[in-house]
Amino acid sequence: MCPSFLVTLLLLQLSSLVVVLVVWAEQLPEFNVRRDDFPSNFVFGAGTSALQVEGAIAEDGKTPNIWDVDSHMGHMPDKSTTDIACDSYHRYKEDVKIMSDIGLEAYRFSIAWTRILPYGRGFINPKGVEYYNNLIDTLLEHGIQPHATIYHIDHPQILEDEYGGWLSPRMIEDFTTYADVCFREFGDRVSHWTTINEPNIISLGAYDSGQIPPHRCTPPGAYNCTAGNSSVEPYKAMHHFLLAHASAVQIYRTKYQAKQKGLIGLNVYGFWCAPQTNSRADIEATKRATAFYTGWAADPLVFGDYPIIMKENVGSRLPSFTKNESELVKGSFDFIGLNHYFVFYIQDDPEEITTPISLRNFDSDMRVKASVKPGDSGDPSGLKNLLRYFKDNYGNPPVYVHENGFGSPQNETLDDDMGRIRYISGYIGSMLEAIKNGSDTRGYFVWSFMDAFEILSGYQTRYGIVHVDFDDKSLKRQLKPSAQWYSNFIKKKNTTEDEISYSSQ
């Protein structure tokens, strides 16, 4: 058994289904949305992660992370590696210049743990610190607000080998130490910190389905796992993620925040779940799915504990927070980052209750079947509904939409990017509706700034608003029409379809 949503995400990365989404996006209504419709302090930006764009995996003292090792084992569908990626490690000045030309107000990037602490702890690599100092300073020189993510699925392989990474509580202390170094070295210039990217997705992909490294699940699973326990490990990993996040926030608030005056939060993959049918069973199943997928991360942040339905269905396999841990986790955010791409359709699956506990996984504990409907999966109303849900159920926390984007095939046509434009404009319009209805949403980041190494498909899928030619050693960057549209939107210019074209950098 394998979590159906992860299988769906993988399928959505593959070219055949991406083509379906392109056709669907061409049929989207265009939103008449303007930059002036948003509050003046609202930021529009774009994002990437170190793993996906930097390359230079063995230069200047950097050691391997789990993805560097995994990609060399041939696990990617296209057999690609993280070795070079977009080579942003060497080309960050060029990339920041492109951001500035587009008019990005903010850039969300991540810091590579093994570039800062090559051995996971202890020795601080001055070359790694220098790189991020240079990147941050260059962003600020161009008037771009740095939003830094401390961990984006790329912990040191040495810690995975030493004690099993996120399955061990030792990771909490090592992550906190690493975060402390980041705050100390960069916090005087970084205004927005995200501790961990998508812990709910990592816990499922790495420890439930085994789809991403370290590829653990109840053997053999859909991905031929050799070790793991899908009935226990995803919950254990998520528990450690939350405690590590809260521990890092405590360090930041105690030692740095008063002087540095930055904000800190956690990023959550924001599922919007809708019932497959109007039956009572599917409606109740949708409530369960929302609690499991989203409440798993959000409830502890706001209430200090996991959702009641999770405790009922998972039982003793779900770790418990001590009183002190609950107090530490509760309120451990100044904002919540949400990543959102698709609507998930939920169907009740009562037969899962008969699955033996030793064979259970996340799906069977939820007792639902989750799927994405081609043609409906990119419904922009999903983002509006998700933001409304956080407003109504979590006290309307400050939210940044950290990721939202459109995947196209590797061989995308360079003279046609209208599908991505309609996708982005549709979601921006939906987000605006949520803001008008009271959501405290403060920023939007397109995923992604440029085509990159995608964790489920390597270089087979392109999410960037900037095209990267991976077949050319120069890795030539080109602005896609979506970059031009986004630029004109941010700069408050009107653009007709005939005026949009590719431009080379």
UniProtKB/Swiss-Prot annotation:
Glycan-bearing residues: 224, 229, 324, 411, 437, 494
Signal peptide feature range: 1-25
Record-level GO cellular component terms: plant-type vacuole
Annotated compartments: Vacuole
Pathway(s) per entry: Pigment biosynthesis; anthocyanin biosynthesis
Temperature effects on activity: Optimum temperature is 40 degrees Celsius.
Gene Ontology terms, MF aspect: beta-glucosidase activity; cyanidin 3-O-glucoside 7-O-glucosyltransferase (acyl-glucose) activity; hexosyltransferase activity
Binding locations of a beta-D-glucoside: 52, 152, 197-198, 341, 403, 447, 463
Disulfide bonds: 217-225
The name this protein goes by in its record: Cyanidin 3-O-glucoside 7-O-glucosyltransferase (acyl-glucose)
Source organism of this protein record: Delphinium grandiflorum
Lineage of producing organism: Eukaryota, Viridiplantae, Streptophyta, Embryophyta, Tracheophyta
